[in-house]
């Protein structure tokens, strides 16, 4: 409500490019869209350093992080095509090849042995500081965090979308009220929490 959260639609990488935001909690693959240069409204620009860190945790919270992303599957086909697909997947997930592939895209390796045996050495070969920082954060996350996955529900995507839309809508309204009467921020915080409790217990 005090203006510290980006509430507009679209990806959070956009406000980073214009200096409207300075921190983003995002997918690791967002590194593909980050820029080491900020361009301001007056068309001036400056170089910045982008640093990746493990997901933030409240002081009394558990170190947990959601694991999600694109998957690969096969469809029923001819024996030759199915064999070719399996051969490709084995090649892609072979430890060293997989590390080489993922470190160019911001993804995580798919095997534990990749973290243990290959990733530390691969980081030394990276030339882009953004990627070096990202994969150092990966090593920290892999060692110190517990991974969880989204519930396997047919309605999950719809629930997630509605959650995001409601949060943006409510916070945008309350943010405007805070701008109009900043002295009421404590009251608005309580009202906002109450609104969310009502919305998410229905």
Q: Where are each of the predicted segments found?
A:
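Flexible glycine/proline-enriched surface loops and loop-helix/loop-strand junctions
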Residues: 17, 67-72, 143-149
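A generic secondary-structure signal for well-formed alpha-helical elements
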Residues: 28, 38, 95-99, 174, ...
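Non-transmembrane alpha-helical segments in soluble domains
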Residues: 1, 13, 17, 86-93, ...
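Conserved C-terminal helix/tail region of periplasmic/extracytoplasmic solute-binding proteins
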Residues: 139-202
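An extracytoplasmic/periplasmic, membrane-proximal ligand-sensing/linker region
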Residues: 114-148
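Extracytoplasmic ligand-binding clamshell segments of periplasmic binding protein
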Residues: 1-40
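Active-site rim elements
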Residues: 2-5, 73-76, 146-155
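Extracytoplasmic/periplasmic substrate-recognition and gating elements
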Residues: 1-3, 11, 39-112
């Amino acid at each position: 409500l005090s203006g510290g959260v980006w509430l507009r639609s679209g990806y959070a990488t956009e406000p980073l490019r214009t200096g409207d935001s300075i921190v983003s909690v995002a997918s690791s693959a967002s590194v593909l869209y980050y820029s080491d240069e900020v361009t301001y409204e007056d068309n001036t620009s400056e170089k910045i350093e982008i640093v990746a860190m493990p997901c933030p945790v409240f002081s009394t919270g558990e170190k947990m992080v959601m694991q999600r992303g694109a998957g690969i599957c096969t469809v029923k086909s001819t024996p030759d095509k199915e064999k070719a697909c399996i051969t490709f997947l084995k090649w892609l997930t072979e430890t060293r090849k997989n590390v080489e592939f993922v470190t160019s895209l911001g993804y995580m390796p798919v095997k534990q042995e990749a973290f243990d045996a290959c990733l530390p050495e691969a980081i030394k070969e990276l030339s882009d500081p953004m990627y070096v920082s990202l994969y150092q954060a990966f090593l920290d996350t892999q060692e110190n965090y517990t991974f969880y996955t989204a519930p396997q529900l047919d309605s999950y995507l719809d629930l997630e979308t509605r959650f995001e839309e409601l949060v943006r809508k409510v916070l945008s309204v309350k943010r405007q009220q805070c701008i109009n009467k900043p002295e009421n921020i404590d009251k608005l915080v309580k009202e906002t929490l109450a609104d969310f409790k009502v919305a998410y217990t229905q």
